[in-house]
Amino acid sequence: MKFVLLFGVFLVTLFSYSSAEMLDDFDQADEDELLSLIEKEEARAKECTPRFYDCSHDRHSCCRSELFKDVCTCFYPEGGDNEVCTCQQPKHLKYMEKAADKAKKFGGKIKKWFG
């Protein structure tokens, strides 16, 4: 009985050691893969298109404002046949940013009064 118990403990120890080595190998492979993905992402990053500039070349390249990303909006000017695309901020997001800015200022005043 003691022999079976010792043999079982030996097998459990051996199994845990081998699985720990396998996990270390997997973790190292994941870290290497993650680093290569980060390097590719940095290489892919480019300049954003400012507000009211042409974004027809890349409609997802508009810059971020304080809280929200601008949207590439396309339209046909009066009397024109070609489409014009510019980065713009939708009105509802503009109003939300103004409200957030006023709330920040009001919060600062309250903090100054009571803080």
Curated annotation (Swiss-Prot):
Transmembrane segments: none annotated. PROSITE patterns: SPIDER_CSTX (PS60029). One of its GO terms (cellular component) is extracellular region. Belongs to the neurotoxin 19 (CSTX) family. 01 subfamily. Keywords: Disulfide bond, Knottin, Secreted, Signal, Toxin. It comes from the Eukaryota. Residues 21-44 form a propeptide. Disulfide bonds join 48-63, 55-72, 62-87, 74-85. It comes from Lycosa singoriensis (Wolf spider). GO terms for molecular function: toxin activity. Its main location: secreted. The lineage of its organism: Eukaryota, Metazoa, Ecdysozoa, Arthropoda, Chelicerata. It is found in: Secreted. The keyword Ubl conjugation does not apply. Pfam families: Toxin_35. Expressed by the venom gland. The presence of a 'disulfide through disulfide knot' structurally defines this protein as a knottin. This is U3-lycotoxin-Ls1a. The keyword Cytoplasm does not apply. Residues 1-20 form the signal peptide. InterPro entries: Spider_toxin_CSTX_knottin (IPR019553), Spider_toxin_CSTX_Knottin_CS (IPR011142).
